[in-house]
Amino acid sequence: MSADSKVQLTALLRAALKSIAPELADTPIHLERPKQAGHGDFATNLALQLAKPLRRRPRELAELLLAELPRSTLVAATEVAGAGFINFTLAAGAKTAAVGTVLERGAEFGRGARNGTSVQLEFVSANPTGPLHVGHGRGAAYGASLAAVLDFAGSDVTREYYINDAGRQMDILALSTWLRYLALYGLDIPFPPNAYQGDYVVDMARAMREGHQDRFAGFTIEQVLEGAPGLPVAERKDDEAKTQREDHLDMLIANAKRLLGEDYHFVHGFALNEQLGDGRDDLEEFGVHFDKWFSEKSLFDTGLVDRAVAELEKRGHVYLQDGAKWFRSTAFGDEKDRVVQRENGLYTYFASDIAYHLNKYERGYDRIIDIWGADHHGYIPRVKGAIAALGLPPEKLEVALVQFAVLYRNGQKASMSTRSGEFVTLRELRREVGNDACRFFYVLRKSDQHLDFDLDLAKSQSNENPVYYVQYAHARVCSVLEQWGGEAAELRAAQLDLLGNERELALCARLGGFPELIQNAAADHAPHQIAFYLKDLAAEFHSWYNAERMLVDDPALRLARLALATAVRQVLATALALLGVSAPQSM
């Protein structure tokens, strides 16, 4: 039951429609797979669509359509259901044909024709100020899987990581590294609570000392702290205390730049490269690859931020207030106007984001997809507003949101905070449960739904663990084929019409729906549909495996069942690969 079956059914309905209402022959025909097994293989609401223009009752129209439906070996049964839906049950041969198609196409089964659409997909884009954490991991798994699905569906995908290397957070990381470095030389400066606290900062400081000895030392505590306001006691959480801590940090950054001179750029670059390199390695080990790493700093170096803001000014969308430049984002649906350039002349993060999206548009992609954390939901109107203000089509930009993943260990939530240094890193998670469990569990839900990640379940070797359950189905087929010991070429001669019991036909139908699933998952930005499909396919295979023998005495039936099992193995492997999960031959 493949996409071809759907095309053929559509053609049959079109012919029937021409017979009863030629003037409506071009009406779009929608065929869907019923959610309940007893409602056939496909259903259409065409009669309900036509009821009003034809002034007929839907059920009456459904009966008329079926009466005019051309005869076809594709259809085994039809029925009118409910208010006027038409259900179709396909002939067994239409379902088993999918097995032959899978064996013929192999790993290419389900791949869509190249559609000429170029897609720029930006994801993860975490500040390179510390190790990637489990929240970044979900965005990475979702983005990588979506990219794979879009590519498999026929698009040309560029996977891009935006490096936030030009903002204040990088200055804080550089300062944090330098202060830890100075401490190695005995300079006991109180470490700011709002600097980066993790052990990785100490590791970077040690690496900097090992490579450059005392090149960045030789300063006094008084020099480093010059002009910095005192730090309030840790217990104070009020706004004034927060402002004092931030002012203290900013003065230390200014002092570091002044004292180090050109060497500050080296320390800044050292910290950036250490963290960026660590993040790249982490992602590569996770099976997440990028085609392009785009530097925020390059937007300033090439003058694109200046140009973007100047263009907004030229178009009348920027005004001056209190010495700052504001973008009129309220004119484009935002809740308030946004600063693009502060009174001190420094651009905001928003200004560089505008320039970055202008760059994306100028590169000529057909579609631009940003994957953001769900906490950035309010950012969408201002970015799309800026795009529209630049005279560009905002609808070209699509934003997919990813909710946070919450880890549970022994039934307890695991806490995390990147600025306090107490966080669960992606690397730690991968080492605990493995890459496969991480990649699969991260896409088990829609990206914009909260995800509770059960560590104990992810590590268990049981049918309750979905990734284990799916991989075990693949390994089971491999074991059966090894016992058989025949050649794969023999399977193409299998008499597929011998596959006739309910479980076998259900498996065939599931396989046949894979190409359509790929297109739907790509259109909906929904790799979780692949995960759901894998769980269903594995469940149907295990049910069949437990009920029937593969290696029966009858050679023809044995070959037919082995052909079906091999087709199941292929689709399992293909779908798992799209999610970045391995397909083991034994378990």
Curated annotation (Swiss-Prot):
CDD domains the record matches: ArgRS_core (cd00671)
Chain location of the short sequence motif 'HIGH' region per the record: 126-136
Protein name as annotated: Arginine--tRNA ligase
Pfam assignment, any one: tRNA-synt_1d
Gene Ontology MF: a single term: ATP binding
GO cellular component: cytoplasm
Any Gene Ontology biological process: arginyl-tRNA aminoacylation
Quaternary structure and partners: Monomer.
Underlying gene: argS
Entry annotated with the keyword Cytoplasm: yes
Keyword Cytoplasm listed: yes
Organism: Aromatoleum aromaticum (strain DSM 19018 / LMG 30748 / EbN1) (Azoarcus sp. (strain EbN1))
Catalytic function, reaction form: tRNA(Arg) + L-arginine + ATP = L-arginyl-tRNA(Arg) + AMP + diphosphate
Family: Belongs to the class-I aminoacyl-tRNA synthetase family.
InterPro entries membership: aa-tRNA-synth_I_CS, Arg-tRNA-ligase, Arg-tRNA-synth_N, Arg-tRNA-synth_N_sf, ArgRS_core, DALR_anticod-bd, Rossmann-like_a/b/a_fold, tRNAsynth_Ia_anticodon-bd
